């Protein structure tokens, strides 16, 4: 049946499952839960269909981020440690969510991330527990092995970097004494190597493409777009449904036979919990919201990866700058339209360095990624010269933020306080990362290609100088997470149990990046998909996949050596 007719039919009965948010996690759940023909699934998305051509083009990342049609573009609160600057937090507002507008970087995280989850009280989330689901979700371009999957819905591509700057990046890492890794999602994450991406046959491979598109015709799956959920319906301590406003402004109340599942992301899920009376009682009362469950952890523990960019001139014409000029863009676009190949078929983050900030650090806490074109921080337009940039990302920041309601009106965006560099230890680590980049580009492999440092510039050497630039230019890597974290019920800061069930509320789960206890070491899209895969089995009552006790590399002398 067409979607509208199907919806009218199902309005007469209860849906087995209601999923709020058709993003990176929601699309996975819609696929897996609707595989049982006896269950009906309603997937509600505030955004629209993701059929824009720009979403398919891997190189159009910045264009998609600038397009508010597909981007929530939340404006953060003034950051105290960043001169009061307000950081924009881009989140996908379309089918596929952020997987439809992100940079397509695919990093699972380090094995010890998940050992940390287990040690924090999240039994069943160790590396051995999650590896089977990482494998199940992917179809890796280099085939399956002990670590990688070969038959999953999500196509993951490993590039073979041939551009001079990419090769110089990896070679310089080796010359600086770091290991070279064959697969950052495999046995060894630490080191320099190729950076996987969720791209297939020259097109972005979002969770909408991978999980939702193949099953849109299932008669027991209904997808409603341009519909914003206003609140959850809680009756006698049980979530029984949701209230949403459709594209015409009509308010609709829908009921769930089994469960309501929030997959609205690290911003949207805690916002909806609080709008529904689940959250810190004092804050809810201040917003005029009746308290259903006093849960102080909702919206707290906000994690992100701070980002700082260094820019360098090229001494040879090896950057992508000419391809960004009007004629170059037209030529690249035509080639992509005809062949799905060329410059437009890449996200241009092809290499990465996962490094430790110093002796005693167990596993990488700094991520270095290179782009073969430098852009202006404010306009995101390419610098009009041959240049490249290297991003310093802090993978385990000590600073924590929070999300609070600005209003009891669901249409009003919440307040986002990340508190970047508020903890002095984060500032120390970011300075170390900047100096690592400078050491990297000073190696022989880079010296042939690298000119002067455009930003922050050779004059910025002291801690004070670097802090000045960190204050004015630190930004986000768009990895907001951990705002409804997993943990035992005895932990007052925990919001959900290890099955994603909200403590104290029956029939309600959260399944997305907000339930991470702590952010993973790398881009968060891959672990978010894994979370949805794993919990889809739990929701259906399936036995978890058998654990995989795979070995992983850790520097044998990490206690005394930085590399």
Regions found by a protein language model. Give the residues of each.
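Conserved redox-cofactor binding core of oxidoreductases
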Residues: 118-239, 243-245, 309-333
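Single conserved hydrophobic/aromatic residue that forms the stacking wall/gate
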Residues: 1-9, 13
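N-terminal glycine-rich phosphate/pyrophosphate-binding loop and immediately adjacent elements
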Residues: 10, 14-135, 295, 305-314
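Loop/turn elements at helix/coil->beta-strand transitions in domains of secreted/extracellular proteins
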Residues: 14, 36-41, 126-127, 219-222, ...
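Glycine-rich loop(s) and the adjacent beta-strand/alpha-helix scaffold that form part
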Residues: 40, 47-52, 57, 232, ...
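Residue-level detector of alpha-helix initiation sites
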Residues: 19, 23-28, 266-267, 515, ...
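FAD-dependent oxidoreductase catalytic-site/capping-region signature
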Residues: 10, 14-15, 131, 137-188, ...
């Amino acid at each position: 049946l067409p979607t509208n007719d199907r919806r009218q039919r199902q309005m007469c009965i209860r849906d087995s499952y209601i999923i709020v948010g058709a993003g990176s996690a929601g699309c996975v759940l819609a696929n897996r839960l609707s595989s049982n023909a006896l269950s009906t699934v309603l997937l509600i998305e505030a955004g629209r269909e993701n059929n824009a051509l720009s979403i398919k083009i891997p190189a159009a990342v910045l264009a998609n981020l600038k397009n508010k049609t597909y981007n929530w573009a939340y404006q953060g609160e003034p950051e105290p440690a960043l001169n009061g600057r307000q950081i924009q937090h881009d989140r996908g507002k379309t089918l596929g969510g952020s997987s439809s507008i992100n940079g397509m970087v695919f990093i699972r995280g380090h094995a010890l991330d998940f050992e940390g989850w287990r040690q924090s009280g999240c039994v069943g989330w160790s590396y051995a527990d999650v590896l089977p689901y990482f494998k199940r979700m992917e179809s890796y371009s280099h085939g399956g092995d002990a670590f990688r999957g070969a038959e999953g819905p999500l196509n993951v591509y490993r590039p073979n970097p041939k551009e001079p700057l990419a090769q110089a990046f990896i070679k310089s890492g080796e010359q600086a004494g770091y290991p070279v890794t064959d697969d950052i999602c495999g046995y060894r994450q630490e080191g320099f190597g190729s950076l996987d991406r969720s791209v297939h046959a020259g097109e972005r491979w979002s969770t909408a493409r991978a999980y939702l598109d193949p099953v849109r015709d299932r008669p027991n799956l209904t997808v409603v777009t341009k519909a914003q959920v206003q609140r959850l319906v809680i009756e006698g301590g049980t979530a029984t449904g949701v209230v949403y406003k459709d594209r015409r402004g009509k308010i609709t109340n829908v009921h769930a036979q089994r469960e309501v599942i929030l997959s609205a992301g690290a911003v949207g899920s805690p916002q909806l919990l609080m709008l529904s009376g689940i959250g810190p009682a004092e804050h809810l009362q201040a917003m005029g919201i009746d308290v259903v469950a006093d849960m102080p952890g909702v919206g707290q523990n906000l994690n992100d990866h701070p980002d700082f960019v260094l820019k360098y001139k090229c001494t040879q014409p090896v950057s992508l700058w000419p391809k960004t000029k009007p004629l170059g863009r037209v030529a690249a676009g035509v080639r992509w339209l005809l062949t799905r190949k060329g410059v437009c078929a890449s996200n241009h983050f092809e290499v990465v360095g996962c490094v430790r900030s110093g002796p005693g650090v167990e596993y990488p806490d700094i991520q270095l990624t290179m782009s073969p074109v430098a852009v202006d921080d404010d306009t995101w337009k390419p610098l009009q010269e041959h240049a490249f940039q290297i991003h310093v990302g802090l993978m385990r920041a000590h600073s924590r933020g929070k999300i609070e309601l600005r209003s009891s009106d669901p249409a009003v965006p919440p307040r986002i306080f990340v508190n970047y560099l508020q903890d002095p230890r984060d500032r120390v680590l970011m300075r170390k990362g900047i100096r690592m980049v400078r050491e990297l580009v000073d190696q022989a492999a880079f010296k042939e290609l690298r000119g002067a440092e455009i930003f922050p510039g050779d004059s910025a050497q002291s801690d004070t100088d670097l802090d000045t630039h960190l204050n004015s230019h630190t930004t986000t890597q768009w990895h907001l997470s951990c705002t409804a974290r997993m943990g035992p019920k005895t932990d007052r800061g925990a919001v959900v149990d290890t099955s994603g069930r909200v403590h104290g509320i029956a029939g309600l789960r959260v399944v997305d990046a907000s339930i991470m206890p702590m952010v993973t070491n790398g881009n968060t899209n891959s672990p978010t998909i894994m979370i949805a895969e794993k919990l889809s089995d739990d929701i259906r009552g399936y036995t978890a996949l058998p654990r995989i006790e795979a070995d992983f590399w850790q520097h044998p002398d990490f206690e005394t050596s930085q590399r």
